[in-house]
């Protein structure tokens, strides 16, 4: 164990919550070694594919698209418009085509051959945060072919604090040091950032099969207010240090399946959100994730943090969550959060393997109540490199203390090289406790990374009621297997955690658990 913290280390602890963020400087397009994962199994997910039979073909080259053009949007859009009249297939073949936003329409197939791609420009002009491919109020749209959408993410982030990525683990397990080094490697947004790569909203019956997104500058594949989305054989391969580059973001949508996909990204791998400021208005349900590999610097699978409206009936199964090459590892493998008033319930997770995931499971109910401080414009300000603005109209009481988490069943989890315990926490505010309820953890086998522990024993652990929920928020907890607070109906069945090296911590700590 490390000696007790000296005065400098204590000061570092006090400023732990400060937001290390680079806010000045021009875009920095240089790619560091290990920005992209060395493990990239494209051949396991993507295959050579023939054009669909029975569909009329609309090749973008026939409309004037050329790999030498600075912007092919007009030519691609004309092909889309004509294909939509007959339910045709828009074909991208013969190389990489730079384009500003292309708007898909109902009843078409976008087919990008495996050797071809559509890519963003390197200025960010011409997108209006709509992404490279945008699909609004459409039905019956298919994306396929084995080709790519390329986001050129590094052209829209500032130089990170560090001049190279960290690949060696610290001598100690220390959450404070992890967070500092993680943020020092991030490329925070320049104001030129255009948005994500693929954005579908208000759509029904969408299919994406045999498709690649590469190097997004923001959310890679955003699914907003949709019903009936099927994604399989899909690859997202991003720069792991471009801030806010999520993999899949599902917001306000129901009946969505993500099957047999690979994600390597800087921010959340697969994320479910449902929030007022995202333009969501209804509950969302019936989301399934299966047979996926996820490399994420933050959370491999996450519900949250944006959660004003209810989320239920979510299943995650047969997945592998892990980190390669760089330090620190993934923040959390499974994160289930209600921060802004949503009821999150009937969540089932089973058969998950993890390696180099700092916190295997993080379940957190709190009262951030973000709808009282932001609207759609202000919520995006920081993410797009602009000054944070307060919302013009606040919904202070609408979602205050309304959130809940219950009926969570997680089973058959194997995790190697973890660094902090499973965390389950409700909150206490104004002398009233709000509980996470009815959680079952079954067949867990957790093993610690072989490093020394920092000694960080505190007299009390704050509630952190109204701040951003993250497993790192609680810092170096005094339990190594499980730390719980404000929980009702917790069941542990065959829950095993190996004892970490020379630990000073207790195995399990329960506080206000009934």
Indicate where each model-derived feature is located:
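Right-handed parallel beta-helix
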Residues: 114-115, 139-148, 204-215, 227-239, ...
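Short, ordered loop/turn segments at secondary-structure junctions
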Residues: 63-65, 115, 123, 226, ...
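Extracellular beta-rich repeat passengers
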Residues: 307, 326-514
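Conserved short loop/turn motifs at secondary-structure junctions
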Residues: 92-99, 247-249, 276-277, 333-337, ...
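Alpha-helix capping and helix-loop boundary segments enriched in small/acidic/polar residues
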Residues: 67-70, 245, 249, 258, ...
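Short glycine/acidic-rich loop motifs that flank beta-strands on beta-rich extracellular proteins
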Residues: 100-101, 121-123, 129, 152-156, ...
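Extracellular "leader-to-stem" segments immediately downstream of a signal peptide or signal-anchor
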Residues: 1-109, 113-202, 207-209, 218, ...
């Amino acid at each position: 164990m490390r000696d007790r913290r000296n005065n400098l280390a204590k000061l570092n602890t006090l400023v732990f919550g400060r937001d290390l963020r680079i806010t000045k400087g021009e875009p920095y397009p240089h790619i560091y070694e290990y920005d992209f994962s060395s493990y990239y199994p494209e051949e396991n997910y993507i295959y050579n594919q023939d054009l669909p039979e029975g569909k009329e073909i609309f090749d973008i080259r026939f409309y004037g698209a050329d790999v030498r053009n600075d912007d092919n949007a007009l030519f691609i859009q004309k092909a889309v418009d004509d294909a939509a009249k007959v339910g045709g297939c828009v074909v991208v073949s013969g190389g990489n085509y730079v384009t500003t936003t292309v708007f898909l329409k109902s009843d078409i197939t976008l087919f990008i051959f495996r050797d071809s791609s559509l890519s963003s420009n390197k200025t960010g002009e011409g997108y209006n945060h709509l992404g490279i491919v945008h699909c609004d109020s459409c039905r019956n749209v298919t994306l396929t072919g084995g080709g790519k959408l390329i986001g050129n993410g590094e052209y829209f982030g500032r130089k990170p604090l560090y001049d190279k990525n960290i690949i060696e683990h610290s001598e100690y397990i220390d959450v404070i040091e992890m967070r500092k080094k993680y943020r020092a490697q991030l490329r925070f947004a320049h104001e030129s950032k255009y948005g994500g790569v693929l954005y579908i909203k208000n759509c029904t019956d969408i299919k994406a099969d045999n498709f690649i997104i590469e190097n997004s500058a923001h959310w890679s594949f955003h699914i907003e207010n949709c019903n009936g989305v099927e994604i399989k054989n899909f690859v997202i391969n991003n720069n792991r240090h471009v801030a806010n580059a999520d993999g899949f973001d599902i917001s306000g949508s129901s009946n969505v399946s993500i099957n047999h996909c690979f994600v390597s990204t800087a921010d959340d791998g697969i994320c479910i959100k449902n929030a007022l400021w995202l333009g969501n208005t209804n509950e969302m349900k019936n989301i399934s994730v299966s047979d996926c590999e996820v490399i994420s610097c933050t959370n491999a699978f996450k519900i949250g943090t944006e959660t004003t409206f209810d989320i239920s009936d979510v299943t995650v199964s047969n997945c592998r969550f892990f980190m390669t090459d760089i330090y620190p590892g993934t923040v959390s493998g499974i994160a289930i959060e209600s921060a802004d008033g949503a009821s999150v319930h009937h969540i089932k997770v089973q058969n998950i393997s993890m390696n180099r995931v700092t916190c295997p499971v993080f379940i957190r109910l709190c009262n951030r109540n973000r709808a009282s401080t932001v609207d759609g414009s202000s919520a995006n300000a920081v993410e797009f490199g602009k000054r944070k603005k307060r919302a013009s109209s606040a919904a202070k009481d609408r979602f205050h203390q309304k959130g809940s988490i219950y009926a969570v069943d997680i089973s058959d989890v194997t995790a190697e090289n973890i660094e902090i315990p499973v965390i389950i926490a409700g909150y206490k505010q104004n002398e009233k406790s709000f509980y996470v309820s009815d959680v079952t953890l079954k067949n867990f086998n957790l093993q610690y990374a072989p490093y020394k522990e920092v000694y960080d024993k505190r007299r009390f652990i704050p509630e952190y009621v109204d701040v951003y929920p993250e497993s790192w928020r609680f810092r170096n907890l005094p339990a190594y297997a499980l730390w719980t607070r404000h929980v009702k109906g917790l069941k542990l069945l065959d829950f095993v955690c190996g004892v970490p090296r020379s630990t000073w911590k207790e195995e399990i700590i329960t506080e206000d658990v009934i």
